[in-house]
Amino acid sequence: PFHFQGQQRPNEEITEIVSANLYRSGRFNLFPPDQFLSHPSETKQVRYKDWRLIKVEALAFGRVDQIGDDLFEVTFHLHDVYKGRPVWKGSDNKEIFYRWTVTGDKLRKVAHQISDYIYKALTGTPGAFDTQIAYITVRQGSVTPQFELIVADSDGHNDQSVLQTLSPILSPAWAPDGKRLAYVGFGDDDTGAT
């Protein structure tokens, strides 16, 4: 759970986004918040026995603090419930946790990054939540269909049209650097990049 402190509640709920990401991965069983015996937002509030009772193996939690007009500080911790300690520790044996300072429109990106940290820590495989997908839609016009190449967050949010054409397009593919897209087109040019 992520505890919010402030006057201006952001549109994006980090807990919901992280939960949805991890659920969609098919690798995690998530507990609904109404089954939590406690709701920590800081390490000193964690009572491991509460989480062991309901058979939780890992606990992700943090805070979202409003520190200015549309400015938020997000703090994220991940703990191993059965070992009774933070997942990440420094050489000095102190907990390593993550902190971001962002505007409200960047909270969804932070939630995707948190999801990636959790996924990697618990599975050993890098997460792909803070990535984008590309897809093509076809809209039926009054005379001819319109094809559109769209880029969106991995969960489908923040979709943006990057190309609209009356000629058919298909097979969008990311360049290895992840910054460019290639596609097959059936117009004047056989292929394109954007």
Predicted regions, residues:
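Short beta-strand->alpha-helix linker/helix-N-cap micro-motif
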Residues: 1-49, 60-66
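Amphipathic beta-strand/beta-sheet edge segments enriched in Tyr/Trp
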Residues: 43-117
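Conserved beta-propeller blade repeats
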Residues: 121-127, 166-184
